[in-house]
Structures are given as structure tokens and as C-alpha cells.
Amino acid sequence: MKIPSIGYVFFLIFISITIVSSSPDHGEVEDETQFNYEKKGEKGPENWGRLKPEWAMCGKGNMQSPIDLTDKRVLIDHNLGYLRSQYLPSNATIKNRGHDIMMKFEGGNAGLGITINGTEYKLQQIHWHSPSEHTLNGKRFVLEEHMVHQSKDGRNAVVAFFYKLGKPDYFLLTLERYLKRITDTHESQEFVEMVHPRTFGFESKHYYRFIGSLTTPPCSENVIWTISKEMRTVTLKQLIMLRVTVHDQSNSNARPLQRKNERPVALYIPTWHSKLY
């Protein structure tokens, strides 16, 4: 539906109050062996909030992620603007965190990153979940990429992309030799030569925007989520590579869907595309 004036004002107020009143976020844990994704397991998603006091938000939070993105219930916003980035080449390290593969950029960032509501967020790391954690109109995809950014005052903003099976993903192709070394040697990390985030095609003309949480412990809230509506492709070989490399004998590292609790979700569409919705 097109965003009504009252709904639009409510969305802006909700975003502004949430960001201003929130405290700095706690980042994702580096060692993921302390929890797992077994549905009924003692360390599974249902019990994450009980494993450590600092992880309590995983069980009691009201703005948790992932969620289902339903086009029939979004507020269409033509004013957010294209999703653009300003990145610089940076050295990086690929690390096996226990349940996913993470690429961490040296110095904690790769250039300027992104700007949201006048605040700069620098790129900290990239990691992948399979299958996707968020769903689109109830549909789950084979892979979801998370680009985790952080502001100077410690607030998080995540940019995510969905993947379907198809042609090889160029960025993952450039990482294959490093992932193979981790798989063969069981080492926990590999240094990567100069990486330019621009190689994985960042810009998006349509995206969802909402406030949520980190999808792994400590599940910190007040995270600004930006999820591209435009689909990427990945081969089955690349998909298997990302799972085999972590050595956790699991075929999934996706947290179950969480309740929206009446949170507003905006969908940015350029004005010249508005007639399509």
C-alpha cells in the first residue's frame, strides 16, 4: 500500500525515538561455539536468553530479528533514497566463528561505509546465514548475507541481501581459495589480501527498513536493518562451501522468525517505480 501521511509520520517518529533513546549496542560474539541452532537443544535458539545474563535480550526482547517481510503490510516510502555506500579497499581476515564464516576488516572498517539519517556507519564485518533468516512474503531463500556496520557511538546497522540458486556470486568466487584452506587445515582464520567491498555490488533501488536486533547472541536491539529487495544468485557449490568450512556438522545457521510486535516496516521505492505497487 502507498504510505499514508499519518503512517509515514508515525514511522519517522518511531525510528527517531528508538535511535535517540537507545544505548550503544553490544556486538555479535566472536566465539559462536557457546550456542547452536538445534531447535530443541539446550543451547538452541529457544534457550539463548538463558545461557548467559548478557544474552537475556534473546529471550525477552520486543524488537528481535529476523522477521517476515510482508509487502501487504509495509509503508511505502519514496523519500529514503537509493542505498549507496562509500567504501575503500581494506585488508581483511576470514574467520570461522563456529557456526558461520565472517570476513572482518582490519582496523574495524573499510572506508566511510554508509550514512543513515545523517549518521555514518562503518563496515565492520560480513557473514552469511543459510538458509536465509528473514523471509519475504513467507518465502525463505537459500542464503542471506549480513554486512554489519557500526557508528562512532557503538550503534549497529546491518545491510542484508537474499540469494537464490543460479549463477556464481563473484565475491564468493574471490574467497574460494581462502575458504578451501580453512576447510582443509581446520584453521580458524585466513588473512585475505586487499578487499574492496565494491566488488559485491552494493547499490539497491528497492529495500526494506526497520528496527530490529542482532540475530545471534547477545541479540542486542535498536539495530537499523536495511534489506535489499533485489535478489542475488549463488551456486549450490558455493552454498555448500560456506557450510562445510565451519565444521559444525549442521546444515543450517538461521535463527527462527521472531514476532514483529507491531513494528513498522518501510519499503523504499523510487517515485518513478511507484505505479508498480
Curated annotation (Swiss-Prot):
Superkingdom as given in the UniProt entry: Eukaryota
Domain Alpha-carbonic anhydrase: 33-269
Cofactor(s) the protein requires to work: Zn(2+)
InterPro entries: Alpha_CA_prokaryot-like (IPR041891), CA_dom (IPR001148), CA_dom_sf (IPR036398), Carbonic_anhydrase_a-class (IPR023561)
GO molecular function ontology, one term from the record: zinc ion binding
A Pfam family hit: Carb_anhydrase
Signal sequence bounds: 1-22
Localisation per UniProt entry: Plastid, Chloroplast stroma
Catalytic activity: hydrogencarbonate + H(+) = CO2 + H2O
Protein name: Alpha carbonic anhydrase 5
Designated gene of the protein: ACA5
